[in-house]
């Protein structure tokens, strides 16, 4: 039976000791794939807005090096959302780190809201043709979507057409949205005959944004089989 470890964290410190501990525990418990939520490798979006570029770059590069090192050390695949610092901008990516290398998925649709305007901050380009990022894990056909992208039918049409087994969704859901997210993802799973693993962030920012966790696995019948709390 294939196992996947969903690690529910706030933003991690630059030290890799905590990540090392939980990756080892994941491997010891039989998981070969580990998934992190959004803004765990990096500070949360509202904090990035006020951070110097060199500090964001240091944070990103140090964490990426740790992921590469630990993936090799424990022979793991690791999925981790990541802020890439470009020459004149930033991009919001999700890394898929394996012992053999790194692939990245660039988020295709970003949040445009006044209080959370990723579309303005990041330089990601929306391609004329949206395509899902697929990979196989122990004979399971997987797709990677950012939380916000789960709202858009175009991705689910492709997921249905390609008969995907599992949709992996790193997220940073906050405010009073817990119930809405559960209902959205249960509906998506049921209507598209696919399982969903949503891995959410926890913690609280300085401006009182509270991330409630609720990492969960939903089967293809739209039923929540397991979920974590708020810690």
PLM regions and their residue ranges:
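CN hydrolase (nitrilase-like) catalytic-core segments centered on the catalytic cysteine
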Residues: 56-79, 151-231
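Hydrophobic residues at beta-strand termini and immediately following loops
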Residues: 7, 105, 135, 199, ...
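Short polar catalytic/cofactor-binding loops
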Residues: 8-14
């Amino acid at each position: 039976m294939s196992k996947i470890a969903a690690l529910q964290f706030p933003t991690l410190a630059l030290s890799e000791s905590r990540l090392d501990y939980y990756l080892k525990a994941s491997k010891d418990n039989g998981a070969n794939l580990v998934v992190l939520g959004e803004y765990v490798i990096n500070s949360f979006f509202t904090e990035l807005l006020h951070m110097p570029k060199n500090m964001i770059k240091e944070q990103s590069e140090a964490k990426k090096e740790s992921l590469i090192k630990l993936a090799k050390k424990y022979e793991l695949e690791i999925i981790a959302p990541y802020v890439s610092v470009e020459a004149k901008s930033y991009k919001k990516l999700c890394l898929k780190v394996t012992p053999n290398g790194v692939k990245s998925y660039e988020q295709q649709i970003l949040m445009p809201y006044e209080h959370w305007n990723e579309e303005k901050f990041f330089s990601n380009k929306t391609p004329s043709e949206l395509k899902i990022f697929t990979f196989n894990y122990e004979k399971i056909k997987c797709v990677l979507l950012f939380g916000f992208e789960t709202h858009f039918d175009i991705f689910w049409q492709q997921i249905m057409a390609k008969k995907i087994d599992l949709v992996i969704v790193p997220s940073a859901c906050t405010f009073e949205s817990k119930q809405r997210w559960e209902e959205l993802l249960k509906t998506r799973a049921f209507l598209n005959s696919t399982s969903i693993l949503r891995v959410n962030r926890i913690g609280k920012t300085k401006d009182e944004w509270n991330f409630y966790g609720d990492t969960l696995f939903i089967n293809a019948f739209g039923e929540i089989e397991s979920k974590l709390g708020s810690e």
